[in-house]
């Protein structure tokens, strides 16, 4: 399912226009992104939790030259599914 299909599904489920569904989806993704940037977690009870994970610095290798290099530590967005979502699958 891509974004436009999700918007259509939201519009049908909530009995609203596609434009309203798109605004709602955009507002939701913006709110989650903003919270994660601030280091917060976003928990939707039953659905799951969005949080920021930390990837440690590690050694890698340049595939072209074989030369070792250091890959910097990074923050990555993560999602942990909630019980209701797991049970639905």
From Swiss-Prot:
One of its GO terms (cellular component) is cytosol. GO terms for biological process: chromosome condensation. The keyword Signal does not apply. InterPro entries: Hist_DNA-bd (IPR000119), Histone-like_DNA-bd_CS (IPR020816), IHF-like_DNA-bd_dom_sf (IPR010992). GO terms for molecular function: DNA binding; structural constituent of chromatin. It holds the Pfam family Bac_DNA_binding. Histone-like DNA-binding protein which is capable of wrapping DNA to stabilize it, and thus to prevent its denaturation under extreme environmental conditions. Homodimer. The dimer interacts with the DNA mimic protein DMP12. It also interacts with the monomeric form of the DNA mimic protein DMP19 with 1:1 stoichiometry. This is DNA-binding protein HU. It comes from Neisseria meningitidis serogroup B (strain ATCC BAA-335 / MC58).
